[in-house]
Structure formats: structure tokens, C-alpha cells
Swiss-Prot record:
<dbReference type="GO" id="GO:0008200">
    <property type="term" value="F:ion channel inhibitor activity"/>
</dbReference>
<dbReference type="GO" id="GO:0090729">
    <property type="term" value="F:toxin activity"/>
</dbReference>
<keyword id="KW-0964">Secreted</keyword>
<feature type="signal peptide">
    <location>
        <begin position="1"/>
        <end position="20"/>
    </location>
</feature>
<protein>
    <recommendedName>
        <fullName>U10-lycotoxin-Ls1a</fullName>
    </recommendedName>
</protein>
<dbReference type="InterPro" id="IPR019553">
    <property type="entry name" value="Spider_toxin_CSTX_knottin"/>
</dbReference>
<keyword id="KW-0732">Signal</keyword>
<keyword id="KW-0800">Toxin</keyword>
<comment type="similarity">
    <text>Belongs to the neurotoxin 19 (CSTX) family. 09 (U10-Lctx) subfamily.</text>
</comment>
<keyword id="KW-1015">Disulfide bond</keyword>
<feature type="propeptide">
    <location>
        <begin position="21"/>
        <end position="26"/>
    </location>
</feature>
<dbReference type="GO" id="GO:0005576">
    <property type="term" value="C:extracellular region"/>
</dbReference>
<dbReference type="InterPro" id="IPR004169">
    <property type="entry name" value="Spidertoxin"/>
</dbReference>
<dbReference type="Pfam" id="PF10530">
    <property type="entry name" value="Toxin_35"/>
</dbReference>
Length: 77
């Protein structure tokens, strides 16, 4: 009986540690942070917006940044 209780407590501790590690890995990306590799990790009320980058007519990348929701950026000419 003691062995069953001890085994249950050990399993509970292991599961708790695994859940704590998962939560610590969920740190959000702040405003203007780069989110190309993890677009779903921007902080609350912030979106991950991406744009295509071209150099001499050739696409050279797709950078993404966490920006405020409902904000539209326009190019200055």
C-alpha cells in the first residue's frame, strides 16, 4: 500500500515538473520583437505581421515582427 502511494506521489511530481517546463517555454514576444519562427507567441493585443522583402526584384526574405493590432503601416515616398 505504501509503495502504491509513493509511486503516485512520484508520478505527480514528474507531471508537475513537465507542465512547469512547458509553461516557462511560453514566454511572449514583446512589441516590435521578431516573430518569424514563432508567429503565435506575440504578447496579448499584439499581432505577428509579416512582409515580403525584395532586393532588385528578387525576394530575399519574409521578416515578421510583433505589431499593435489594427495598425496599418504605409510606405513613405
Amino acid at each position: 500500500m505504501k509503495l502504491i502511494i509513493l509511486t503516485g506521489l512520484v508520478l505527480f511530481a514528474i507531471v508537475s515538473l513537465i507542465e512547469a517546463e512547458e509553461e516557462s517555454g511560453r514566454v511572449c514576444i514583446p512589441l516590435n520583437g521578431e516573430c518569424s519562427k514563432s508567429p503565435d507567441k506575440c504578447c496579448d493585443n499584439i499581432n505577428c505581421d509579416c512582409y515580403l522583402r525584395f532586393e532588385k526584384g528578387v525576394q530575399t526574405g519574409r521578416p515578421c515582427f510583433c505589431t499593435e493590432k489594427d495598425v496599418i503601416f504605409e510606405r513613405d515616398e
